[in-house]
């Protein structure tokens, strides 16, 4: 029996899908890259913007075809969209067999058994399942052998007016350090070199416990023998403190890269979003980061066209981009999410104007990214070789999260090696291996 999982959305969803794959393998299923031959198809959904919603329904329409030659195939929908609108999805696609949300993934074996018995298995919990940590006991099935996501906190207590995540993922719930370290140890023994700590608001880790802080978790993970690199995503600017930044600077395992979403540069819009900081306060965090970690590579998220945004507000965002000089910016037009406070606010600019602002912003960032990449020309950088591509190039990332294609021997796969950068592109670097461990 075979399974296929289609994943939309963030790293948390990717990690959830890895856990689902682990559950299915435990049940005797094997993965397939061809959904047409799958006995179980799961669609792990995202609800952060409208476009992923549409993609999910399109994918389901395609997957429906599997039932023609395999009537007993099970099709399931899970994740954030399922948590928010699972019953609506089922009404639109009644051929679905399973629907479940974000906190009861560990119920998948029971739901699958119910569906295989010929029943519809729909379980969307209004409250967080008190046994959701049982999910962490299952192995992950990863595409990447040498890097791994580790969920350290679930949910978000922030109430940003545009965001559906607190509704779909619930309040913040941290995992105990001991549980996290056991998972990290298992991953290292499985060959993982780089640990990527993730959460909807990873820098809030431990606040619900009151007896442990995020920087203490970073130190503990760094002490696990065999952990060569540590990254973490995504933090909220309000929860990033100087103690954490100092630990980032002090621990050699922590990579010099950080994703710190600003969302908008205008204080008026930031207040309307209920982000809890001003432009000045955000830039003070950036200043601290650059003070302690001068070579840090920064990335951010930006929403263009939040209700009420004027051109002057937009220019404040442009000003921040120019001042910070991010290595990467993930920018999107505002997408109203049903059930959020901002969804009731009227749009004040035309779609054409918002598209122009977004395109101008993206083009500005492309130039900044290329300028930042040019600094790597003829430099020697460390990469973790993660794979070999179809052109027989080694593929890896620098500590600053730059994608590198390198000439070198396959023996370097899974190793930290030095690469001399010989060519700089807008979104990647190219070079040759000059040594390895």
Swiss-Prot record:
GO molecular function, one term: metal ion binding
Pfam families referenced in this protein's UniProt entry, alphabetically: Radical_SAM, TRAM, UPF0004
Compartment(s) where it occurs, according to its Swiss-Prot or TrEMBL record: Cytoplasm
Domain Radical SAM core, residue spans: 142-371
Chain ranges of the MTTase N-terminal domain: 1-117
SMART domains: Elp3
One GO CC term, this protein: cytosol
Cofactor detail note: Binds 2 [4Fe-4S] clusters. One cluster is coordinated with 3 cysteines and an exchangeable S-adenosyl-L-methionine.
Superkingdom of source: Bacteria
Catalytic activity from the UniProt record: N(6)-dimethylallyladenosine(37) in tRNA + (sulfur carrier)-SH + AH2 + 2 S-adenosyl-L-methionine = 2-methylsulfanyl-N(6)-dimethylallyladenosine(37) in tRNA + (sulfur carrier)-H + 5'-deoxyadenosine + L-methionine + A + S-adenosyl-L-homocysteine + 2 H(+)
Cofactor or coenzyme needed: [4Fe-4S] cluster
UniProt subunit comment: Monomer.
Family matches, as NCBIfam families: miaB-methiolase, MiaB/RimO family radical SAM methylthiotransferase
Protein name, entry field: tRNA-2-methylthio-N(6)-dimethylallyladenosine synthase
Organism of derivation: Sulfurihydrogenibium sp. (strain YO3AOP1)
Gene: miaB
């Amino acid at each position: 029996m075979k399974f296929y999982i289609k994943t939309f959305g963030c790293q948390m969803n990717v990690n959830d899908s890895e856990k689902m794959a682990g559950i299915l393998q435990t049940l005797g299923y094997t993965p397939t890259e061809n959904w047409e031959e799958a006995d179980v198809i799961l669609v792990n959904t995202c609800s952060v913007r409208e476009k992923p919603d549409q993609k999910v329904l399109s994918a389901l329409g395609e997957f429906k075809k599997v039932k023609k030659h395999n009537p007993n195939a099970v099709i399931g929908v899970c994740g954030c969209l399922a948590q928010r609108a699972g019953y609506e999805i089922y009404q639109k696609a009644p051929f679905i067999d399973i629907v479940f949300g974000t906190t009861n993934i560990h119920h998948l074996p029971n739901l699958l058994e119910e569906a295989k018995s010929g029943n519809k298995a729909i379980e969307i919990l209004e409250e967080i399942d008190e046994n959701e940590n049982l999910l962490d006991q299952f192995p992950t099935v990863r595409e990447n052998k040498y890097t791994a996501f580790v969920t350290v906190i679930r949910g978000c207590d922030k109430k940003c007016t545009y965001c559906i995540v607190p509704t779909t993922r619930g309040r913040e719930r941290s995992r105990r350090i001991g549980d996290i370290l056991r998972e990290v140890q298992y991953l290292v023994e499985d060959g993982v070199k780089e640990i990527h700590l993730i959460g909807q608001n990873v820098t809030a880790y431990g606040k619900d416990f009151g007896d442990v802080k995020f920087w203490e978790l970073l130190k503990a993970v760094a002490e696990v023998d065999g952990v060569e690199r540590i990254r973490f995503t995504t933090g909220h600017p309000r929860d990033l403190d100087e103690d954490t930044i100092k630990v980032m600077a002090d621990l050699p395992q922590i990579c010099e890269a950080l994703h710190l979403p600003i969302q908008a540069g205008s204080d008026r819009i930031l207040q309307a979003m209920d982000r809890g900081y001003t432009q000045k306060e955000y830039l003070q965090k950036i200043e601290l980061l650059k003070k302690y970690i001068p070579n840090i590579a920064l990335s951010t998220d930006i929403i263009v066209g939040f209700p009420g945004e004027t051109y002057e507000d937009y220019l404040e965002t442009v000003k921040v981009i120019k001042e910070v000089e991010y290595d990467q910016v993930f920018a999107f037009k505002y997408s109203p999410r049903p059930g959020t406070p901002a969804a009731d606010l009227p749009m004040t600019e035309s779609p054409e104007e918002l598209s122009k602002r977004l395109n101008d912003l993206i083009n500005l960032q492309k130039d900044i990214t290329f300028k930042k990449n040019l600094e790597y020309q003829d430099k020697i950088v460390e990469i973790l070789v993660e794979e070999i591509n179809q052109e027989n190039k080694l593929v890896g990332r620098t500590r600053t999260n730059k994608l590198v294609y390198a000439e070198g021997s396959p023996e370097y796969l899974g190793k930290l090696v030095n690469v001399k950068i010989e060519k700089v592109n807008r979104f990647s670097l190219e070079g040759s291996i000059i040594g390895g461990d």
